[in-house]
């Protein structure tokens, strides 16, 4: 049987897309492999959000060129595919920089992958069009991959933040219909998935057709999903502060499947920098939004994204970011040094922050965020929480799962608990996960 190796870089949507590409190849007779050396088709599903991520792809392609040559010497064919956002952004340039690549395919065209592979036997192929047809209508049924799963409900972004390539690589905001999302969710649950994370570049801008043909909100979509038998938990990511509707806030209080966790990027605490980033909100507007969300769900865990060293950022601007972090308190966060991306407005600016200053600011921010994360996890010790068991743990007799607040937890229980919710008393907080004990009889009953 032919074998396919699919590697994904970057965001959760890339992980979803990588899985769907594996499904497309499986329908063509390819079995999945984790060993690139034995693959007949190698797919790199790429991320273009930062320069470092893009350069990783070219480094990997250099290694794959050698592998392709070695396999050819033994009479084995290898097709190399570059997919995702680097493919969309750089197109034919990839063929120039990486001679071993056979197919370049953008994120809106990967349902065509089998045809592109066939075409590549005659000539190298680039497909970075935004086709009129909905790719989701052309994808095969999803295969079961575990207890949790991603489900794309929205793609693209209309916000045009000054630092971001997503509007150029993923296109304008489009949403799938409620019926299509519910049907895919139903199939996932039938395959064993118990927790679904709804994903989109700007997921709370969701506006897919509802049952009556009118645009539905993300809150309404989650209400519809809560009726899927066997579905236990719902999450969503990534959101924009400007698209947080009242009914989405209310869903955190009224829909029992919506978990008390929210990833809501803010990027900076400085109003001056937020304006330069074209974020269209202020630091205080973000604070007020968080206050409203916490009023609806007081125990909600918050995470965010931050960029340090955006062009023109001063010490005073950075101090405002630290103040916002201190004011709000996060359970987790992702923080990065600004990386210019060709074609974005910020890349044209001439007031770059020195690399050494970026490094210093990132270290200070991450120190504060790490202290908040450790304090948040330490506060969980002694509490009783419900763990959705996802897999076996690191040690024999151990399983691992997540709290409603998306904290990783390990505890002793049989593998038969995988896919069930087990009440667990948290006994210890480690550096990256929590440890606990299942309530007596709970694990056995599961």
Curated annotation (Swiss-Prot):
The positions annotated for binding [4Fe-4S] cluster 2 are 157, 161, 164
Ranges for domain Radical SAM core come to: 143-375
The terms describing its cellular component in GO are:
cytosol
Name any cofactors this protein relies on.
[4Fe-4S] cluster
Task: Give the EC class as a word.
Answer: transferase
Q: Where does [4Fe-4S] cluster 1 bind?
A: 11, 47, 85
Residue ranges occupied by any TRAM domain in the UniProt entry = 378-440
Task: Report the InterPro entries cross-referenced here.
Answer: Elp3/MiaA/NifB-like_rSAM, Methylthiotransferase, Methylthiotransferase_CS, Methylthiotransferase_N, Methylthiotransferase_N_sf, MiaB_methiolase, rSAM, rSAM_horseshoe
Subcellular localization: Cytoplasm
In the UniProt record, does the keyword Iron-sulfur occur? yes
Q: What Enzyme Commission number(s) does the record list for this chain? A: 2.8.4.3
Task: Could you list this entry's UniProt keywords, alphabetically sorted.
Answer: 4Fe-4S, Cytoplasm, Iron, Iron-sulfur, Metal-binding, S-adenosyl-L-methionine, Transferase, tRNA processing
Question: Assembly state and interactors?
Answer: Monomer.
What does the similarity note say? Belongs to the methylthiotransferase family. MiaB subfamily.
Protein name listed in UniProt: tRNA-2-methylthio-N(6)-dimethylallyladenosine synthase
Organism, as annotated: Methylorubrum extorquens (strain CM4 / NCIMB 13688)
């Amino acid at each position: 049987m032919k074998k396919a190796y699919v590697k994904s870089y970057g965001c959760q949507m890339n992980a979803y897309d990588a899985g769907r590409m594996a499904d497309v190849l499986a329908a063509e007779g390819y079995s999945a492999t984790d060993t690139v050396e034995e693959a007949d088709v190698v797919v790199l599903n790429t991320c273009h959000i930062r320069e470092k991520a893009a350069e990783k792809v070219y480094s990997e392609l250099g290694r794959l060129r050698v592998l392709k040559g070695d396999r050819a010497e033994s009479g084995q064919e290898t097709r190399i595919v570059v997919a995702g956002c680097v493919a969309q952004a750089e197109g034919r340039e990839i063929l120039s920089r990486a001679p071993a690549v056979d197919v370049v395919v953008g994120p809106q065209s990967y349902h065509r992958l089998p045809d592109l592979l066939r075409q590549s036997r005659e000539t190298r192929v680039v497909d970075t069009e935004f086709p009129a047809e909905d790719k989701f209508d052309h994808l095969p049924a999803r295969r079961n991959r575990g207890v949790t799963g991603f489900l794309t409900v929205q793609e693209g972004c209309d916000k045009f933040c000054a630092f971001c390539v997503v509007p150029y690589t993923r296109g304008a905001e489009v949403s799938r219909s409620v019926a299509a999302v519910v049907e895919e969710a139903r199939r996932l649950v039938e395959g064993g998935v118990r927790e679904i994370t709804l994903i989109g570049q700007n997921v709370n801008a969701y506006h897919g057709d509802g049952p009556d043909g009118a645009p539905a909100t993300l809150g309404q979509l989650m209400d519809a999903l809560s009726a899927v038998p066997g579905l236990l938990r719902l999450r969503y990511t990534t959101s924009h502060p400007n698209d947080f509707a009242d009914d989405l806030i209310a869903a955190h209080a009224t829909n029992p499947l919506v978990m008390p966790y929210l990833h809501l990027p803010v990027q900076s605490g400085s109003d001056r920098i937020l304006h330069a980033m074209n974020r269209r909100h202020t630091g205080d507007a973000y604070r007020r939004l968080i206050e409203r969300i916490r009023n609806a769900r007081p125990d909600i865990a918050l995470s965010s994204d931050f960029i340090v060293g955006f062009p023109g950022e001063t010490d005073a601007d950075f101090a405002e970011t630290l103040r916002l972090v201190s004011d709000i308190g996060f359970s987790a966060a992702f923080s990065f040094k600004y990386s210019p991306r060709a074609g974005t407005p910020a890349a044209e600016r001439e007031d770059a922050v020195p690399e050494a200053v970026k490094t210093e600011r990132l270290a200070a921010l991450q120190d504060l965020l790490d202290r908040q994360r450790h304090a948040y996890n330490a506060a969980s010790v002694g509490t009783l929480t419900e763990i959705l068991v996802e897999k076996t743990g690191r040690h024999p007799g151990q399983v691992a799962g997540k709290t409603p607040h998306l904290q990783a937890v390990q505890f002793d229980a049989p593998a038969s608990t995988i896919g069930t919710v087990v009440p667990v008393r948290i006994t210890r907080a480690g550096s990256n996960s929590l440890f606990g004990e299942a309530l007596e009889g709970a694990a056995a009953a599961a």
